[in-house]
Amino acid sequence: ILGAAPTAEEGAALVKSYQEQGILVTLVGGIIDQCIEQNVKMGASLRVIPLGYDVTSVIHVVSVAVRAALIFGNVKPGDAAGLMAYTKERVPAFVNAFSPLNEVIVAAGAGAIALGFPVLTNEDTFEVPGALIPKVAPADMNAASLDARNIKIKITKIDIPVSFASAYEGEIIRRGDMQVEFDGSRVDCCELVHMKEPGEIEDHKIEVIGPDLDEFEVGSKHSIAYVVEVAGKSMQEDFEPVFERKFHSYINCIEGVMHTGQRDMIRIRISKDTFNAGFRLKHIGEVLYANVKNEFAAVVDKCQVKVITDPELVTKIRHEIAVPMFNKRDERLATMTDEAVDVYYSCIMCQAFSPSHVCIVTPERLGLCGAVSWFDAKATNELDPTGPCQVVTKEKPIDERIGEYEDVNEAVRKFSHGALDDVSLYSIMEK
Ligand code: SF4
C-alpha cells in the first residue's frame, strides 16, 4: 500500500482486512502513520510490514518478489522475460496506491505493472484494463484487488470483537500485557472433543459455566476446560483427537490470545487489549464452533461448546472424563504392533516450514512431533483423502528386521520431493 488513505480509519481498515485474509501487507509512506494512529500492530510476524516513508523503499518488496522467482521458480539471473513471466503468473501480488500520485509513484507503479502486479488507486486517472485500475474507493479496494488477481479466499467469519487470522499464530503475550492466564501446569485444565448422539446436541449452543474474564483479577491464573461436543452421521471416535490437535492453531489465530500445549497440559494467555476490546470466554466457544463446523463439515452435522472455569467442575472433568479418555486412546495404540496393520501413513504437515520433511507414521512409530499417531494419521486421511496424510503400503519388504520397504522408500522419495532416498523404520545405526 502506497501513500495515505483519505482518512486514517479507512487506511487501517484496509490493512486489517488484508491481514485477516492472511495476506502479507507492506506499507510505504503516509499509511504507516495512519496505522500507528489507529493502533494497528505491525511487524513481520503479524504480516504487516512498514517499509519506509519514501516511495523508493518499495524496492524492498520488489526484491522479495524477484527473489521468489529466483529461488522457487528457478529463474536464472539475467532472464528478464522469464522473471516477469514468473512474477505475473506465480506471485499473486498487487499494489494499492492512494492519491495524490506523483511521477515517482507512477514510475514505481509502472514497474509493478511490468512485473504483472495490477495497481489500484482512488485517483481519477486513465485506465489500463487489468493493469491500472483507477477510481476505486478505499472501502472497495480489498475486493477489487483480489478480483484483479483472481484470488479466492475461503474466510470463516466469526462473531468475535478482535481479528481472527493466521497472521496472529506466532503472537507472544508477555506477562505484563496479559489480562488473565489459564495454566495447565499449575491448575487443572483440559481441552476435549466428545462425540455424542445428534439428539444430545443443540447446534451452535455456546455455554460458559463459571466466572467469566471480567470476574478475574488482572494477571491471575485460572482453570479452564473446553469441551466440544459433536455429532454427525459419518463422525467416528477416531476423529476426536484429530479435531483436538487443531485447537492449538484455532485459538492462536485469535488476535491477542496465545495457546500452547495440548490435552490437559495447555496454557492460554489473553491480552489486556483483547480483553478491553470486549473478548470474553464465549468467544473461545465461537472460534471453536466456527472452525470445527467449517473444517470438518463432511463429518460434523451438529456442534456445541462448553467453556468451563468453575475450578471444582474443571478438576472433575479433567480427572474423571478427559484423562481416562486420553488413556483409553493411548492404550488402544499401545496394544497395536506394526505387523498388525497392512498400511502405514505419511505425514507432511510440517512442510509449511520444512519443505522436504516427511514422517512415516506406524502404530509403533509416532510422527517426529509425538502428536500424530497411526490412528490420527488414518483419521486425517479419511477426513481429507487428498490432505497431508497419505496411505503408504508395505508390500515390498527389503529388510523387515530394520523396517525397510521398497514402497515406503518410494513414498519417502515422492513426498520429500527427492530430498530423501530411503528410510529404515527401526534403525539409525545400520541405515
Ligand atoms: S507427524 Fe511429522 S510431519 Fe506430521 S506434524 Fe508430526 S512432525 Fe510434522
Q: Where are the predicted features?
A:
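Structural motif
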Residues: 2-8, 28-31, 51-54, 73-75, ...
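Glycine-rich beta-alpha loop segments
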Residues: 4, 13-16, 25-26
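Histidine-anchored nucleotide/phosphate-binding helix
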Residues: 8-19, 110
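Short, charged/polar "capping" segments at the starts of alpha-helices
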Residues: 9-12, 32-38, 58, 101-107
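Long alpha-helical solenoid repeat scaffolds
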Residues: 22-24, 33, 45-50, 62, ...
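Extended, intrinsically disordered, low-complexity regulatory segments of metazoan chromatin-modifying
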Residues: 45-46, 52, 67, 90-94, ...
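Cysteine-centered metal-binding/redox modules
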Residues: 73-78, 84-91, 99-105, 111-112, ...
